[in-house]
Design a protein with these regions (language model features):
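Internal mixed-charge
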Residues: 1-9, 29, 36, 40, ...
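Solvent-exposed beta-hairpin/edge-strand motifs
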Residues: 62-79
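A generic structural signal for short, non-catalytic loop/turn and secondary-structure boundary residues
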Residues: 57, 64-69, 95-99, 174
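Generic beta-strand hydrophobic packing signal
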Residues: 52, 71-74, 133
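Surface-exposed ligand/attachment interfaces on beta-rich extracellular proteins
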Residues: 51-65, 113-123
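Subunit-assembly interface segments of extracellular/virion macromolecular structures
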Residues: 9, 13-24, 33, 37
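Extracellular ectodomain segments of secreted/surface proteins
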Residues: 36, 40-57
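Short, glycine/acidic-rich hinge or "gate" loops at secondary-structure transitions
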Residues: 21-24, 45-52, 146-151
Length: 183
């Protein structure tokens, strides 16, 4: 479904199908806002839905084709890199003394969609974006929609067989990765 169709569904729900009170571009702004929120939640709760991979050769540095919101994994010659830094949301650097094959798994930024663009999302998540738009237009609290997004992403993740563990995180982050305890 393209973005204009998603926005038309929101127009139906707010009772403004003649588009007298709001323009499609007004609702497009809410769509992009909701899409950015959803993309961040996808990175946290169901990364396989939006995971991208980039490979290149380099000496301790690789530049991604676009900005990312999360780096899931960095490998050098098929071995995990534990210590790396992300610069300007696009460049990954680490200590190396010779050229190697570098592979990065990451979550891209959502970017800004235009009306004619495809949403690229499953229908269930498009419906949640419609809900988000309606809530923003009506100035309602979006915490309920956000909770529904999290629940939907966890259900999708469970359905993909990716959630067979309990996630434990400490109070203080210290920049470490999360610990998954398999059940």
């Amino acid at each position: 479904m393209n973005v204009k169709q998603v926005i038309n569904r929101a127009f139906m729900q707010i009772g403004d199908t003649p588009q007298e009170q709001y323009t499609p571009y007004h609702l497009l702004e809410y769509y992009n806002e909701g899409n950015h929120l959803l993309n961040a939640l996808i990175g946290q709760y169901c990364p396989s839905l939006a995971q991208a991979t980039h490979e290149d050769n380099g000496t301790g540095r690789i530049t991604l084709p676009g900005q990312c919101i999360s780096v899931l994994n960095v490998k050098v010659d098929d071995a995990d890199v534990q210590a790396y830094h992300v610069l300007n949301l696009q460049t990954i650097v680490f200590d190396a003394d010779h050229e190697q094959k570098i592979t990065v798994d990451y979550i891209m930024t959502a970017g800004y969609k235009k009306l004619e663009d495809e949403s690229g999302l499953p229908a269930e998540l498009e419906t949640l974006l419609v809900d988000y738009i309606v809530y923003r237009v009506m100035n309602l609290d979006i915490s309920g929609v956000t909770a529904n997004m999290v629940n939907a992403l966890q259900s999708i993740n469970d359905g993909l067989g990716n959630n067979e563990s309990v996630i434990a995180e400490g109070y203080w982050n210290y920049g470490s990765k999360r610990i998954d305890y398999a059940g």
